[in-house]
């Protein structure tokens, strides 16, 4: 059964020293799949929807800010669900993301990673706390300036070879070079090395 709703009532609550008005978000409850979908507002653009576990619905809807398609991630061509919160101590607004609310506070140097790389899938089963490096390796696209067509494979002008290079323990490591006519082999090798060094955080080819 699908249930449709809207939290359009005005709610004034205390957030630190900052008073905020909650404008609300449309939502859909899918009881059969035990999920809910929250509409993300976008200025003058079509809305997007984010998926959460049904047991997180009250937490998300009762949060004192409206959820928007807040930040674009070019690596996955999609938007994070979030809001902008004004902090008087900094005299500026800072982003706060829905996945942070769902998972809770992370330790220093930690990030929340979307396992399937769908950043609008905020079900707890799709979220995990990782290091900054692990979060960076779990990606779907090669760098925008990549000419080889393969992740972690680039042309080295000096040696005139295809170079396989990965970030390992925070450092860029040159692993192996391949001749000009061995590009496909270089791509296969790069994929194997990602699996070796990154494991479940290797991302897509």
Identify the residue ranges that each predicted region occupies.
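A short, exposed loop/beta-hairpin motif centered on an aromatic-Gly-Thr core
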Residues: 171-183
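Polar, enzyme-active/binding microenvironments
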Residues: 151, 180, 203
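Short helix-coil boundary/hinge micro-motifs
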Residues: 2-84
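An aromatic-rich alpha-helical recognition segment common to small helix-rich domains
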Residues: 53, 99, 153, 186-194
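Short, cationic Gly/His-enriched loop motifs
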Residues: 1-5, 10-22, 88-169
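Short arginine-rich
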Residues: 192-205
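Short, surface-exposed linear segments at secondary-structure transitions and domain or protein termini
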Residues: 56-65, 103-110, 181-191
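Short, mixed charged/polar active-site loops
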Residues: 46-49, 91-95, 172-174
């Amino acid at each position: 059964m699908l249930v449709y709703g809207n939290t359009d009532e005005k709610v004034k609550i205390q957030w630190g020293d900052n008073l905020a008005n909650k404008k609300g978000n449309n939502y859909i409850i899918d009881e059969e799949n035990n999920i809910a979908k929250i509409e993300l507002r976008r200025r003058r653009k079509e809305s997007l929807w984010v998926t959460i576990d049904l047991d997180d619905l009250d937490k998300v809807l009762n949060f004192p800010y409206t959820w928007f398609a807040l930040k674009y991630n070019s690596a996955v061509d999609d938007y994070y669900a979030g809001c902008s919160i004004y902090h008087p101590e900094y005299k500026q607004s800072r982003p706060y993301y829905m996945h942070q609310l769902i998972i809770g506070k992370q330790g220093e140097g930690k990030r929340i990673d979307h396992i399937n790389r769908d950043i609008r899938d905020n079900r707890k089963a799709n979220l995990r706390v990782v290091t900054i490096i692990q979060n960076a390796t779990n990606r779907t696209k090669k760098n925008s300036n990549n000419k080889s067509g393969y992740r972690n494979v680039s042309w080295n002008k000096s040696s005139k070879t295809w170079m396989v290079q990965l970030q390992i323990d925070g450092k860029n490591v040159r692993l192996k070079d391949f001749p000009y006519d061995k590009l496909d082999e270089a791509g296969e090798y790069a994929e194997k090395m990602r699996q070796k060094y990154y494991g479940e955080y290797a991302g897509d080819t």
